[in-house]
Amino acid sequence: DETANVKRAAQRVAWGKGINCGQTCVAPDYFLVHENVVDDLVKQLDECFHQYYGADILACDEWPHMINRHHFDRVMGLIENRNPNARVAFGGRGDAETLRIEPTCLTGVTLDDPVMGEEIFGPVLPVLTYRTLDEAFDIVRTFEKPLACYVFSDDKQVQHRVLTGLQFGGATVNDVVIHLANNHMGFGGVGNSGMGAYHGKVGFDCFTHYKSTLKKGTWIEMPIRNPPFGDKINLLRMLMR
């Protein structure tokens, strides 16, 4: 939200999106930004990517490439097939020889754009804006429950509302991705993003079948539970209340 440290948010989102150039299941998929800080955020993102990967990112040996030509073409198509009012704030170029695509930020995106219709799994970051937190929630709930949610805010009430008011697999506050690196916390999805969780004790429990077992002695029998019941029915009903 508008209380967030915009520079830190840009640094950390650029880092998380840059891991395998967005080809991870927990990469930031889209950025929902308060309208008062969106211009600053986009500017800072552009600067961060170039700080990390140099002036010509397509020529940077540390910038990963797409897994194959099919996905290169798919992601380039998401950039090119945007609505007429959407624009490439930075990036947008691809090299079919190396299968590299520049970190690309799209602004003016609508929920009907192809880039919002699938998991991107590439270095494209659409930016949507909101005015109120309720409006932001409505946008998030348009989609299936995500595997990860990242909230950047210095307002603890906003953090609490996001963490308790939305459904997602796991979350990080004021950073991205790193929640899954903690082996003491479960990692997994909910609904369309997955079932169950693993890591540490949570993983042990997930892949363990706990057999419910009851052991009884044989020194006495309870005739009240055995037929014929007759007048015992009323007593049984009292005991079962």
Show where each model-derived region lies.
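ALDH superfamily catalytic-core signature
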Residues: 1-110, 173, 235, 240-241
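Conserved C-terminal structural/oligomerization subdomain of aldehyde/semialdehyde dehydrogenase
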Residues: 100-241
